Design a protein with these regions (language model features):
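Amphipathic alpha-helical dimerization/coiled-coil segments
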Residues: 86-111
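Short beta-strand "wing" residues that participate in macromolecule-binding interfaces
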Residues: 65
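Intrinsically disordered, low-complexity and often Lys/Arg-enriched segments
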Residues: 1-2, 111
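Basic, amphipathic "hinge/linker" alpha-helix immediately C-terminal to the N-terminal HTH DNA-binding motif
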Residues: 71-93
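Glycine-centered, phosphate/nucleic-acid-interacting loop/turn motifs that mediate DNA/RNA or nucleotide
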Residues: 61
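Basic amphipathic alpha-helical segments that dock to polyanions
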Residues: 50-57
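N-terminal helix-turn-helix DNA-binding core of bacterial DNA-binding proteins
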Residues: 5-49
Length: 111
């Protein structure tokens, strides 16, 4: 049986990107691969969603980017988390935890 690949909830992609980039400088393809690996193949980020999100996060000042060479020898844009991005990640993680706890409370409710 194949694995169902879930669509990301609206608004969670930015948080996931910030979290992955917090681990160290990484290029766009590396971000999508890391999300897929860490989620045990459940989450898959399409390029059509990833790159607009990266540009948006960079424009907001949450990510900084520099050009470098990828493992394959190709020129790639590497992203790192800015101080502003680190603060935003903390805020988003806090909000996510609060939301997750609220959903869990509802799911545990006995009918």
């Amino acid at each position: 049986m194949g694995v169902d690949r879930s669509e990301l909830l609206q608004g969670t992609l930015d948080m996931l990107i910030l979290k992955i980039v917090a681990l160290g400088p990484v290029h766009g393809y590396g971000i999508s691969q890391r999300i897929q690996q860490v989620s045990r193949e459940v989450l898959q980020v399409q390029q059509g969603s990833l790159y607009p999100a990266l540009h948006r996060l960079e424009k907001r000042g949450w990510l900084a980017a520099t050009w470098g060479q990828s493992d394959s020898g190709r020129e790639a844009k590497f992203y790192r988390l800015s101080a502003k991005g680190r603060r935003q990640l903390q805020l988003e993680e806090s909000q996510w935890n609060r939301l997750s706890e609220a959903v869990a409370l509802i799911l545990r409710t006995v009918s």
